[in-house]
Amino acid sequence: MSKRDYMNTSVQEPPLDYSFKSVQMIQDLISEEPRTGLRPVKYSKSGKSLTQSLWLNNNVLNDLKDFNQVVSQLLQHPENLAWIDLSFNDLTTIDPVLTTFFNLSVLYLHGNSIHRLGEVNKLAVLPRLRSLTLHGNPIEEEKGYRQYVLCNLPRITTFDFSGVTKADRSTAEVWKRMNIKPKKVRIKQDVL
């Protein structure tokens, strides 16, 4: 199967589903069997999954150490990973490893322990990210939570399972002007 054929078919492929497996470390996925759904996951001749979706929700992960290496062992084309579900784990930060998947369009992080709103800024480098969930994290209690996320991730079209409207964008822009101070540019003065 060519890469082009893969890109056309794998979007409809079922996810590689490791949800509800009590996984504590990413490395444990290598020895764990994925859950089976209504449709079977397809595999390449080398034994790697031909999907673009990885579900790791409802486990006990507290970090993503070795995530790239493990994903490379599980997926035929890890660079095409488009959907990662890490909801309902014990993550306290948004690991920068997630920003290496430039085709990522759906990222579920709800129900974790992320407590710094600034963590969201890491995701700004993902050009295709359109759907993000963060509700159920301590950051949800921060004043201006929704506006902050929408200001920093302007390409998001769905946030916390709600569509982003023009009114949301407008409110976020007003919030940004009122709450985020522009960085001062220092002018270097020549001393004679």
UniProtKB/Swiss-Prot annotation:
LRR repeats lie at residues 49-71, 80-101, 103-124. Residues 137-175 form the LRRCT domain. PANTHER family: LEUCINE-RICH REPEAT-CONTAINING PROTEIN 51. Coiled coil: none annotated. This is Leucine-rich repeat-containing protein 51. Its main location: cytoplasm. It is found in: Cytoplasm. It comes from the Eukaryota. Keywords: Cytoplasm, Leucine-rich repeat, Repeat. Pfam families: LRR_9. GO terms for cellular component: axoneme. It comes from Rattus norvegicus (Rat).
